[in-house]
Each structure stands twice: as structure tokens, then as C-alpha cells.
Amino acid sequence: MSNDTSPGTSSVDSKSSDPSYGVPGHSHSDKDLLKLSLGAIGIVFGDIGTSPLYALKECFKGHHQLPVDDFHIYGLVSLIFWTMGLVVTVKYVMFIMKADNKGEGGSMSLLSLIIRGANPKLSRWLIVLGVFATALFYGDSMITPAMSVLSAVEGLTVIEPSFDSWVPPVSVVILIGLFCIQARGTESVGRLFGPIMLVYFATLAILGAFNIITRSPAILLALNPYYAIHFFASDPLQGFWALGSVVLSVTGAEALYADMGHFGRQPISLGWYWVVFPALTLNYLGQCALLSADHEAIANPFYFLAPDFLRVPLIILATFAAVIASQAVITGAFSVTQQAIQLGYIPRLRVNHTSASTVGQIYIPSVNWVLMFMVMVLIAMFKNSTNLANAYGIAVTGTMFITSCMMGVLVHRVWHWKAWQSIPLVSFFLLIDGAFFLSNVTKIPEGGWFPLLVGFVVFTMLMTWSRGRHLMAERMRQVAMPIQLFIRSAAASAVRIPGTAIFLTPEDDGVPHALLHNLKHNKILHERVILLTVKIEDVPYVDPHYRASMSSLEDGFYRLIVRYGFMEEPDVPLALNKIEQSGPMLRMDDTSFFISRQTLIPSTHTSMAIWREKLFAWMLRNSESATEFFKLPSNRVVELGSQIELVGSNGK
């Protein structure tokens, strides 16, 4: 629960069946549909759209190199085509994108959807899966900008091989510039993303079709799944290893689901079916037609698709596409972080709005600078896209596998599918995802360790924060005085002064620490005392008409509950202003806010390992204050400190 006494956001309440929660689904006119599809092409498909820069090349030059001959060329392009068809089209577009949480997608949204009403044991395992998928996403958010920009800038070596040493520093300059402009927002230039990516995908399609026609029209036969099956049947071990590079063709598939709340399922599907999938297919086929005619083009088949005089413009266009793909991942990291803060897995962080008119345009400084630092580390460590490709696939395939696991729970518990319906379909997805993941496990020594390390570090921090908050809330419930007892005893004899005091409290049935400290030290109570609890629900948005509910207790005490969805930013003064308009009792110019700031003290009875307790204490100290997080007027806030000792059941 996001409040003064709890360092994170509120415990999630299940209100999905209440019509007051959530927002209507997406419905669009034809004009709006085209605009949203163009926007989706610019944001959602940036990552998967830059895959042709490196995916096919890595199949032949990567971890397990393959001979450049027609057998492998036809087999691999057939495998890439059917991977895109099965993973992106069937799994994500036709199936997973139907699993929206009031229009929102992504791991956190799916997690909040499937744990509703689940028994505690199942919930714990689901939370572990969902949080680990989120942790892997942060590793992917570090690798994608480095991989995309390095691959684009490596086009310089096609023009002049001696430019090879310039690729890392040029990539660093481009990415530092990208991270530095985040604070200003990208709304103005963001309008150009769709048109630029549309030109980029058109270029992919034209170059691919040109090479198919002029080099080897027979490559179209590779659309027959026979070639993919024959490739595997001839050498199953070699086929298994190849999956580790083939999966690079679908990096970014998770973005279709994660960004569904911004554009809607229909515009994303339209963009995939009519623009992105055909363009990618033609480009991969074109690269393979080129390789079939000229095996030496494997050095960089993407750029060799273009005639000499078009390579510089293609490098510029590909670099723009790589920057847009990187921007989409950075924005996604901000969005996922905001959701995790609201759902109580990450401490309160400073969140800045970069647009007064567009919802969701946010900037989180701490996340931005950590991502930038880690991207620079990656470029310094791996130096080129071939080396970095070894680190890329494992985070992507791990997230895909976990999403399939959670979907299995969804179709059984939420959609109530019969076993004969759900088991074959989910097993099919798990088989595909599992094969891709295991193939990438072989890359762990060459770079796959990096996203796993990042994932485990982030997972540990998220679970430590969640566990620490739970223990803190448990301890505060143990020592809290019932509000009715407080009103009848201490409050009845206190001196009352004019005005309104609002005390933020994590629970809606106890006396907040700040109220007890205020009465103990100041010996007074205000004429009106409001106990305010901010609750984050398990839906993306809460209907503003049901935002706040106030009930009278007795003797000038009131209970106020303000609700937000996990995609919303709490703005307490704005919510109180709505109440003020409905009656004269609450006037902001006559109101003071009292909040409590906890300090964790060492405990010999803690149920957390000592290193986790110290980690939680550090995160607690560095979390943003409730004043900033809830947008309280700083000149009307009184902050009172308190100490707390974690206790709880045994366990680590």
C-alpha cells in the first residue's frame, strides 16, 4: 500500500468484477485505427524490426557456425519464417494478446490478473515467475540498445573495413545522446517514429524483393516448412544449436503484448499482418537469395542487399531505426518500473512527467542513468554485435517461457478452459519456448551469463522489497491501536483546535503512528481528523467517479480511501479537490498533512537473512518521500519519524 508508513505501493485489492474499476476497451474508427497502427509500427515493432540487421548473420557466424551453402540457407530461412509465424503470429497476436487486464498487457499486468483469488501457495509461485520475468526484462533493456545500435553502425565496415575500430565509440556517442534527452521527453520527435519506421519497413521489403527477383527466385520455396523440418531431421543437434540464433528474429515479440495498453490489440495486429511480417519475410528471403548467389556476402548480408550508392543512406536509416528501437525499450523500462512501484515490488522512485497532454510520457532518472551505465559497460565488454548476440537470446527466451507458463494458469483459472483444450496448446508453446531457451543456455559462458546475472540481481531486490514491506506491515498491524479504542480514550480528552489534519496510514483499521506521535508530543488534535489510505487496485485504471470514498467514524474522525490503478500516478491533492467540491468540510487552505517516515533498526528476531534486511533498509532509506510521491503540498506537510523492527515467521 502506497502511503506514508509503507515504503511502496498498496497491497493489491481484487476489484475486477466491480464496474467502477478499469476503463473501457479500445474501439476505434477507421481513421483512428490507421493512426494507431502507424504509432504501433513506430514503437511496438522497433525491436523486432531491427532483427534483420543481425539475426541471419549470427546463424552462420555466431556461437555455432554453420556452412554457407544452399542446404543451410534454405533450412534457416524456412526456420526463421515459421518461427515468426508460430511465435509472433500464433502465440502472441492470436492468443496471448487476448489476455489483457482491462486493456493492459505485460508481465506485471498478467501477474495481477492471474493471482486474483489464487490460494497463497499458488500465488507465491506465480509471483516468483512474474517478478523473474520482469527482472529478465531489465537485462533485455540493457542489451537491446547496445545490440541494435552496434549492428546499425557496423554498416560502416561494409563501406570501409578500417572503420571497424570506430564502431564502439560512435555507438557510445549515439546512445549517450539518446539517454541524455530522456529528461526532456520524446513527444515531439515521437510523432516521427511511425513514419520513419514505415519507410524503414518499406525499404526492407523493397530490398528483399529486389534480391529475390534478381538473385534467386527459387528461395521462395523455403516458405515450405519441409525445408525447416529437413534441416532438423538431417542433423538434430546442429538444428538445436541453430535455434539459439534463429530466436534473434523474434526479439521484441513480447513488446506486442507489453505495449497493448498504449495502442490496443487491433492496431498492433493490423501493423503486424499488413506491414511488419511481410516486410521481415521479404527481407530475410532477400538476404538468403543474396547468400545463395554470393556466399561472401555473409560478412553483412543486410547491408549487401543494397547497391553501393544506397549503402550510406541505408546505414543512416538503419541507425534511426535502431535508435527508435532503443527508445521503445527505454520507455518500456520506465513503464514497467512505474507498474512495479505501484504494485509494491520496487521502492518509490522519482517519476517525472514529460508531457502535460499525453498520459504515460514519464521519465525516471534513476532507471535512465543505470540503464545508460550498463549499456556502456556492455559495449566496452563485447565490442561488436556478434559477441553481444551470445548474451541476447537468453533473456528474451526466458521471458517468453515464463509468459507461456502464466498463460497456462490463465486459461485454466480465469478462462476456465477444459483440460483437453488448454493442455495441448500450452504444451505446444512451452515446447517451442523451452527449445529456444535451452539452446541459448549453451551460450552462457560466452555472454549469456550477463542477462541472467542482471535478472537474478533485480529479482533479489524486487522480492526483498516485497518481503520487507510485508513484514513491516505485519509488524505495524501488531502494534497498532484500534481506531475506535483510540477515539473513545485518548481522543476524547484531547484539546481540539480548528482545521483539518490528514494522516496517511497503510491500514484502514488502525491508528497511524503519526497520529499517536502528534498527540503524544503536541497534546492536541484538530477539529477534523481524516485517516487517509491510498490503495492500488489490480486493474490499470480506476473510474474517477469511484476514486474516493469517505465514511464518518465519530467525534470528528473520518476514514478516507483513495483508489488508483497500477498504471496511474497517485495525486492526492487532486482527489481531495474533488471531495472539496462536493462539500465544505474539506478545504485545502485549512488542511495539514501528517506523514511518518520509518527507520529500520537491526533485529535479532528478523525472518529475513541479515544481508536481505540490510538491503531492504538501504532501499527504504533511498526511496522517495511520500510528500513527493503523492504530490502533497510541501508547505502543508508535517513529517514525523519512527523506528521499526522487522519480525515475522521463520524463513529467509
Curated annotation (Swiss-Prot):
Q: Which GO terms describe its cellular component?
A: plasma membrane
The UniProt transmembrane annotation reads 36-56, 76-96, 125-145, 161-181, 193-213, 228-248, 270-290, 314-334, 362-382, 391-411, 419-439, 444-464
Q: Region (Disordered) spans which residues?
A: 1-26
Compartments, record wording = Cell inner membrane
Against InterPro entries, the record matches this protein to: K+_transporter (IPR003855), K_trans_C (IPR053952), K_trans_N (IPR053951), Kup (IPR023051)
- The residues forming a coiled coil are none
Q: Which GO MF terms are attached to this record?
A: potassium ion transmembrane transporter activity; symporter activity
Q: Where is the composition biased (Low complexity)?
A: 1-20
Quote the catalytic activity from the record.
K(+)(in) + H(+)(in) = K(+)(out) + H(+)(out)
The answer to keyword Transport applying to this record is yes
Chief place where the protein resides: membrane
Membrane topology of this protein: Multi-pass membrane protein
Keyword list, A-Z: Cell inner membrane, Cell membrane, Ion transport, Membrane, Potassium, Potassium transport, Symport, Transmembrane, Transmembrane helix, Transport
Q: What does this protein do?
A: Transport of potassium into the cell. Likely operates as a K(+):H(+) symporter.
Say which family it is in.
Belongs to the HAK/KUP transporter (TC 2.A.72) family.
Q: What is this protein called?
A: Probable potassium transport system protein Kup
